[in-house]
């Protein structure tokens, strides 16, 4: 990564903060949140962009330290269990941006209009340019195909603008005539614009109309573009055009789950202070209903936050205590169901997920919705209906076989059996119980390992 080499001191300082203990990070987050709130260019005019568990935790954390600002979300994109929490906390629901029919886009409409969000936001954007050639994007398309930039890019070669050869083989077909290649052309549109129309533009429009600036539950530990932006700009970024705060920038997944448990306690003590929004007055002010008590702030889609047994030798425990002033080590926190959530129709990075991937899990929780998303989103020129199933087939991701199918048990390695056993009850066919593991490809992680046949019988392990 060249960006970290060009900014070594910033990155070094940020990483040092990420390595601090939880107490330091929590106090640091509070300090940075207040600094943003009190900045003269912000002057307390803030809101919280709320989505899943991370930002729900942020909303409650800010309230717990005395920062009482509104929360907003395009809740219709979230799982129903997340919508339930949003409603009880008084999160303001925003609508997606308007589409061609002069009404808010639906999730299906944005895919039909623009294309499937697949691989990654960056790659999808490049594929979309190849699928929609114009004189204006000719230079960028050339860089995507060859890695060569024009005058604006300094006439460089072998730049990161070039799409990987693997995906050029699949999506570079529209440029075959120009470059004398024989790449494939995808039988579906690809786009990186779903997030923009469904989430980003509604939030930007709200920020502009309300003149408020966002707190966001972003963490550098999530990697990708977020990591780069947060490491270079820090928790608070204030410029002429952009003002935003990410108090959890230095948090890890363990930190956010630890804080979520603390915010659970805070909520249960203060739940009557949160009222659902029921409508608006003629002057635009909000109407509120009676408080709704939640049994937990953790949406059902995540399951519960639990701590796994400690897996350390005595020597490792002693070393840990020596490094942490005698503190006892604890097992890792995790959620028993989904670890991350997002739009049910989003396919970004699904190609690198272990199975069961997000669409597999949707099949278990909402079979009707799964059927629709996999098979009935778009129609091709022959009138045939298709959905994510066609896209996943094209990029080599399985989706039709089912972990719960006891007539077709899956070949799984020992590590994946142990991991899946935390979420499902795993069983072996009677004839496979006495068989020795054989070398093969693991259905879940895709690695060459010693594997045995297993299938799932319940969505949670039997107790």
Please tell me what each predicted stretch does.
Residues 334-338, 427-440:
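Short linker/helix segments within small regulatory modules
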Residues 443-459:
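Short metal-binding segments enriched for Cys and/or His
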Residues 2-14, 41-47, 241, 253-268, ...:
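ATP/NTP-dependent adenylation/nucleotidyl-transfer catalytic domains that generate, transfer
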Residues 341-344, 411-414, 440-443, 448:
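Cys/His-enriched microdomains
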Residues 218, 271-272:
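Short secondary-structure boundary segments
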Residues 350, 420, 437, 446-449:
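Cys/His-rich microdomains that often coordinate metals
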Residues 2-255, 260-262, 413, 425:
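ATP-dependent adenylation/nucleotidyltransferase module used to activate substrates
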Residues 352, 422-426, 451-452:
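Short, non-ligating residues that shape and space the ligands of small metal-coordination modules
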């Amino acid at each position: 990564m060249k960006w970290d080499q060009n900014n070594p001191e910033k990155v070094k300082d940020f990483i040092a903060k990420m390595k601090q203990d939880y107490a330091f990070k929590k106090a640091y987050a509070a300090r940075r949140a207040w600094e943003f709130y009190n900045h003269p260019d912000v002057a307390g005019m803030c809101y919280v962009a709320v989505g899943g568990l991370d930002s729900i935790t942020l909303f409650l954390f800010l309230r717990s330290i005395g920062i009482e600002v509104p929360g907003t979300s395009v809740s219709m994109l979230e799982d129903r269990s997340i919508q339930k929490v949003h409603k009880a906390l008084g999160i303001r629901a925003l609508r997606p941006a308007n589409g061609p029919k002069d009404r808010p886009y639906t999730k299906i409409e944005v895919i039909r209009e623009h294309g499937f969000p697949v691989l990654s936001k960056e790659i999808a954007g490049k594929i979309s340019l190849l699928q929609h050639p114009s004189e204006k994007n000719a230079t960028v398309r050339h860089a995507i195909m060859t890695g060569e930039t024009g005058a604006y890019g300094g006439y460089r070669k072998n730049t990161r603008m070039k799409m990987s050869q693997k995906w050029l083989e699949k999506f570079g077909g529209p440029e075959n005539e120009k470059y004398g290649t024989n790449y494939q052309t995808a039988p579906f549109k690809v786009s990186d614009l779903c997030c923009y129309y469904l989430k980003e533009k509604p939030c930007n429009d709200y920020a502009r109309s309300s003149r408020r600036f966002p707190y966001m539950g972003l963490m550098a530990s999530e990697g990708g573009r977020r990591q780069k932006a947060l490491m270079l700009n820090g928790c608070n970024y204030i410029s002429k055009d952009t003002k935003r705060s990410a108090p959890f920038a230095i948090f890890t997944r363990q930190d956010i789950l630890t804080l979520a448990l603390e915010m659970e306690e805070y909520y249960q003590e203060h739940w009557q202070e949160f009222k659902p929004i029921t409508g608006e007055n003629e002057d635009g002010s909000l109407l509120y209903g009676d408080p709704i008590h939640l049994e937990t702030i953790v949406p059902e889609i995540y399951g519960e936050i639990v701590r796994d047994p400690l897996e350390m030798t005595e020597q490792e425990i002693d070393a840990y205590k020596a490094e942490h002033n005698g503190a006892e080590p604890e097992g890792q926190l995790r959620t028993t169901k989904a670890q991350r959530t997002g739009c049910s129709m989003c396919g970004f990075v699904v190609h690198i997920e272990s199975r069961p991937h997000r669409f597999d899990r949707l099949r278990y929780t909402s079979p009707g919705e799964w059927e629709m998303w996999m098979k009935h989103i778009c129609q091709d020129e022959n009138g045939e209906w298709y959905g994510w199933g066609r896209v996943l087939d094209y990029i080599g991701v399985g989706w039709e076989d089912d972990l719960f199918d006891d007539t077709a048990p899956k070949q799984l390695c020992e590590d994946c059996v142990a991991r899946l056993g935390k979420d499902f009850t795993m069983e072996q066919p009677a004839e496979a119980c006495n068989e020795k593991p054989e070398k093969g490809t693991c259905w879940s992680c895709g690695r060459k390992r010693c594997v045995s046949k297993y299938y799932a019988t319940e969505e949670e392990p039997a107790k």
